[in-house]
């Protein structure tokens, strides 16, 4: 199943924390999560699917001091 994944790492290492994890499973659902000290938090899943496989889209993420 095709998917898109965007991760905002807290450091330049692969095993670092992930402040924001965004994964689109085209045609199915979207998952958002974060990882601290090697442990994933509770994922947030959305069945609201605005993305379609093969269709172009713009991804814009606002980064504020206290939230995304």
Swiss-Prot record:
GO biological-process terms attached to the record: regulation of activated T cell proliferation; regulation of T cell anergy; regulation of T cell cytokine production; T cell apoptotic process
Domain Galectin: 1-68
Compartments it resides in: Cytoplasm, Cytosol; Cytoplasmic granule
Cited Pfam families: Gal-bind_lectin (PF00337)
Family annotation (InterPro entries): ConA-like_dom_sf, Galectin-like, Galectin_CRD
Listed GO CC annotations: cytosol
PROSITE patterns linked to this entry: GALECTIN
Keyword Transferase: no
One GO MF term attached to the UniProt entry: carbohydrate binding
Keywords associated with the record: Cytoplasm, Lectin
Entry annotated with the keyword Cytoplasm: yes
UniProt subunit comment: Interacts with CEL.
Purpose: Regulates immune responses through the recognition of cell-surface glycans. Essential for the anergy and suppressive function of CD25-positive regulatory T-cells (Treg).
Protein's UniProt name: Galectin-10
Native source species: Pongo pygmaeus
Lineage summary: Eukaryota, Metazoa, Chordata, Craniata, Vertebrata
